[in-house]
Amino acid sequence: MLPAHKQTLEALLADSVTQVAHALKGADAAFVAPAITLERPKVAAHGDVACNVAMQLAKPLGANPRQLAEKIVAALTAQPAAQGLVDAAEIAGPGFINLRLTAAAKQAVIAAVFEQGRAFGTSDRKKGKQVLLEFVSANPTGPLHVGHGRQAALGDVLANVIASQGYAVHREFYYNDAGVQIGNLAISTQARARGLKPGDAGWPEAAYNGEYIADIARDYLNRETVAAKDGEPVTGAGDIDDLDAIRKFAVAYLRHEQDMDLQAFGVKFDQYYLESSLYSEGRVEKTVDALVKAGMTYEQDGALWLRTTDEGDDKDRVMRKSDGTYTYFVPDVAYHVTKWERGFTQVINIQGSDHHGTIARVRAGLQGLHIGIPKGYPDYVLHKMVTVMRDGQEVKLSKRAGSYVTVRDLIEWSGGAAPGQEAAPDLIDEATITRGRDAVRFFLISRKADTEFVFDIDLALKQNDENPVYYVQYAHARICSVLNELKSRYNVDVAQLPGADLAQLTSPQAVSLMQKLAEYPDMLTHAAKELAPHAVAFYLRDLAGEFHSFYNAERVLVDDEAPRNARAALLAATRQVLENGLAVLGVSAPAKM
C-alpha cells in the first residue's frame, strides 16, 4: 500500500473509531483513541490490510470486540473517501478488521513510480535533521579485512537508507592512530627495512607478518611519497634508525592503501577523524579533568577509575593505568564529546560485536560529564564475524595481509580473479572489480548484522538463481531486454506507457507484483527507523521473485495493445524500483547480463 493511501486509510479509520466511541459513550465522554496500526495479513486470502483496533477498544469501551469491529467497518465504508480505497471489509476471529483494496488503489503504484522515478520510495519527513554515522574506523596498521568490509557495507547502505528519509547524513571514519599497534607497525617496517623477515632471528615478536610490510619498507627506503586523501604528503626518509619517521610514513602509506580499498568498494567518507588529534589538542586530558571534577572518578592501586557502575555498568573501569597511559575507551569518550559539540544529537556507530563491552563505558563517561548528552547516546549497530569459504574450505590467509582475508581479496575473487592473481593487480580489469564489488556489497548486507555470515566465493561466482545478487540483477536486465524488444517490435517507448489501461492487470501474479512495489517506501522507512539495512536486500530478492512469477505467468509481448502496454508498464515500474533499491545498496543495475 502506498504511503499516501495508508495515511488516508489510517485517518478514515481513526474518524470511524471516534464516531463509534461517541455513539457508545456520548460525544462529551473522555476518550483516548489508540493509534491505528495497519498491517499486511500473512495469508493473502485474508485481504490486503488488517487492523486490530476493535480489540484494543473492547475494554475501554466495554463492548464486544467483534461487534465493535462491525460498527467501525460500517462507519468506515459510509465515508465517501473510503470508497475509492476499500473494495470490501470482513471481520475475522475475535475482531480483526480485514480490508480489501480497490483495483485502482493497487494499480496506483505504477503511476506513482512513473511520476517519481528515482525519488520513488524516498521521503522528506526528516528534512532538516542530521545524523553522524561512524563506521569502518580501522587501525591504520594493515589492509582492510573482511570484517571491515561487512562494516563498510552496513554503514554505507544504512547511510543511504537514512538519507532516503530526508536526513543529512555525515559519514565519518575514526582512525585509531595513537595506540600500541602503531608502534608495532613501526618496528615491523623497521625490521623489514633491515632485511629481516618473519621467522628470522631478531624478528620482533609483536611484528606484523604480511607482505605489505615489505612493500612499505621498500618504498620508505626508496624515499617514495605517499598521502591519504585528507592528509599531507609524507616522503620516506630512508633512515632505518629513525623510528618516528618510519611510523609516520607507514601510517600514511596504509591510510592511502585503505583509501584504495574503500574506493574499490564504492565507499566515501565526509570526514576522517584522527585519534592522535584528541591528544595533540588536549581533548583527552580535558575530558579526564572534567570527570575528576564531576566526582566520577577515584584512585586505587595507583590507577584512576571511572565510576561506571553509577551509570549501569557491571563494575567500575580503569581510565588511567598505573603507568600513566589511558585505557582505550578514554579517547573514545573524548571523541564522542566532539560529536556532540559539533551539533550531532543523533550518532550511530557501527562496530564489531567484540566492542560490546565498550558501550556501557563510553555512555557512562558521557553521562558523567553532565553536559546534556542524553542516555543511550550514541546508538550502536554491532555486527558479527565473517567467514570466507572457497571450494568448500575456509580461507584464512591472504598473501597481502599474511593472517587474514582482505576486502580487496574478496572483491577480486568474487569478480572472477583467479587465486594468486591479486599479486598482479594490473591484470584485473574494471569489469572484474565491478562484479566483485556488487557481489560483496550485496552478500555482506544480506543478513542481519547480529548474525554470523559465511561468504561463499563459489556462490558469488554462480550465474544462476542460487546467487542472490545475480538473481536480482538478472530481473532488471531481463526487463530491460523486454522493453527494448517492445520498442523494436511494436515501436512503443517507455515514455508512452503511463497512458496504459492498467485495468488489464487482473491476474494474481500482477496484483501481487503491484503490492510488492507499493511496499518499497514503507520498507525504507522501517529500515531507517530500525537501523536495519538488510531489509533492502531482503525486499529486492522478494521483488525479483514476484517479477519472475509474473513474467512466467503472463506473456508481455503480445499483439493486443491494451494488455501488452499494461504489462509493459508494470515491468517498467518494476525495473525502476529494482534500480532504486540496488542504488541504495551501492550495487549496479546492468541492462545486459
Swiss-Prot record:
Record carries keyword Cytoplasm: yes
Record keywords: Aminoacyl-tRNA synthetase, ATP-binding, Cytoplasm, Ligase, Nucleotide-binding, Protein biosynthesis
Motif, 'HIGH' region: chain positions: 138-148
One annotated Gene Ontology cellular component of this protein: cytoplasm
EC number assigned by the record: 6.1.1.19
UniProt catalytic activity: tRNA(Arg) + L-arginine + ATP = L-arginyl-tRNA(Arg) + AMP + diphosphate
InterPro entries xref list: aa-tRNA-synth_I_CS (IPR001412), Arg-tRNA-ligase (IPR001278), Arg-tRNA-synth_N (IPR005148), Arg-tRNA-synth_N_sf (IPR036695), ArgRS_core (IPR035684), DALR_anticod-bd (IPR008909), Rossmann-like_a/b/a_fold (IPR014729), tRNAsynth_Ia_anticodon-bd (IPR009080)
Subcellular localization(s) per the UniProt record: Cytoplasm
SMART domains: Arg_tRNA_synt_N, DALR_1
Subunit structure, interactors included: Monomer.
The name this protein goes by in its record: Arginine--tRNA ligase
Species for this entry: Burkholderia ambifaria (strain MC40-6)
Gene: argS
